[in-house]
C-alpha cells in the first residue's frame, strides 16, 4: 500500500450479458397462420386505426406545447441597432460591444463612441478637480486649487 493512499471498497459489479442464461431448447412461439388470424369487424378496425392515428399525432406534438423558445429568439433592445449610427445589426455578423450595454455595427462606430465618452469624462474631471475655496477676507477673493 502506498503512503497517503487509502483503500477503496471493491466496485460492485452489475449483471452483464454473459451472465444472463438463455434456454434455447424451448420451442419458440409460432406465428399464426392465415387460418388462425381472426377477422375484425369494420367498427373494431376503425377504432384501432383511430387509436393508432391519435398516438402518431401525440408523438409529434411536444408535451410542452409551442411555448418553448430559445434564448436566441429573444434579443435585447440594445442588440437590435447600432448605438451610434442606429443601423440595424444583422444576425450572424459580428457585434462590437462597449461597456456591456452598448452594441455597435463596426469597430469605427465603437471607437467614435469611446472617444466621445473620454471627452465627456475629461470635461467632468477638469470641473471636479477645480475646487473653489472662499477665504475669510472681507474683499471676497476666491482661490481655486487643483486636486
From Swiss-Prot:
Primary location group: nucleus
Positions annotated as zinc finger (FLZ-type): 77-121
GO cellular component, one term: nucleus
Localization terms from the record: Nucleus; Cytoplasm
Domain of life: Eukaryota
InterPro entries for this protein: Zf-FLZ_dom
GO BP, one annotated term: response to sucrose
Keywords: Cytoplasm, Metal-binding, Nucleus, Zinc, Zinc-finger
Keyword Iron-sulfur applies: no
Induction: Down-regulated in response to mild as well as prolonged energy depletion. Up-regulated by glucose, sucrose and mannose.
Pfam families to which the protein is assigned, alphabetical: zf-FLZ (PF04570)
GO molecular function: kinase binding; zinc ion binding
Oligomer and partners: Interacts with KIN10 and KIN11 via its FLZ-type zinc finger domain. Interacts with KINB3 via its N-terminal part. Interacts with DELLA proteins GAI and RGA.
Family: Belongs to the FLZ family.
Function text: May act as an adapter to facilitate the interaction of SnRK1 complex with effector proteins, conferring tissue- and stimulus-type specific differences in the SnRK1 regulation pathway.
Family annotation (PANTHER family): FCS-LIKE ZINC FINGER 5
Protein name, entry field: FCS-Like Zinc finger 5
Organism: Arabidopsis thaliana (Mouse-ear cress)
